[in-house]
Amino acid sequence: MRARLFLGLMAAAPAAAMALAVAPAAAADPGVTVYPGMEIRQGSTLCTLGFVDPEARAAFTAGHCRGDGPVTDKAGHVIGAMALFDDNTPDGATVTGDHQIADWGAIALADDVQINPVLPGGRALVIDEAQAVSRPGQQVCHFGVVTGESCGTVAAVNNGWFTMGNGVVSQKGDSGGPVYTLTPDGRAAIVGLFNSTWGGAPTAVSWQSTGQRIREAVATQPASSNTGIEAAISFTSESVDAGVNPPA
């Protein structure tokens, strides 16, 4: 039996909804709860989970967090498998504002995990398109498993990514963690996934840019390449099925 994952991320584009159908990941240990801001591991890589969608049974983190084997929590309990990813994060290169950075990983959650879309601090993490990062000075917070929650402001808005300062801190292991704004009703609206530190400034990829990149990644895969992951992109007037290669 296959588990169909309707990526809630695509709610940011009302005209389209995307689903990934994957062979179910290895069964999770009963009682494992998955939530944004938790520690996740894949092989020897330790990162932070950025967003979970209970209805979709999907989760998101940084693409450079991928590793060997299933995705687990810090105790080694299986929570799912990396279904798709993209990562063009420069290694040792000088990055300018016009450089477009992609860094996302989509996780198909195992059937038995419990999903709680609430940050460790108690705020529900939601999608609110009106809260997108658009200007320097905008207030944001970041949660990483190493540094916890830190808040500050957007320093610069670049090509699909932004830098932060005035209180936002990070350490290795915070990658993939959620960056969010606080809403008047007491929730947190996701605006990015933590990427790295460039020029001493904590950096995140834009949630809106990430959504667009996922749509493009799925839509451009040839149907003949289907080797176990199936993507269906449904538009208001048409439906297109395309095969998607799993990550190598």
What name fits each language-model region?
Residues 94, 119-130, 165-166, 235, ...:
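Second-shell loop/turn segments in exported
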Residues 43-158:
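Serine endopeptidase catalytic core focused on the charge-relay Asp
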Residues 15, 25, 31, 223, ...:
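Generic low-complexity segments that are intrinsically disordered, proline-rich and/or Lys/Arg-biased
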Residues 21-33, 39, 92:
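Cross-kingdom Sec-pathway N-terminal secretion signals
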Residues 12-19, 51, 106, 196, ...:
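Hydrophobic alpha-helical membrane segments, chiefly transmembrane helices and signal peptide h-regions
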Residues 1-28:
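Secretory targeting and sorting signals
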Residues 32-45, 59, 116-123, 146-235:
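Active-site region of chymotrypsin-like
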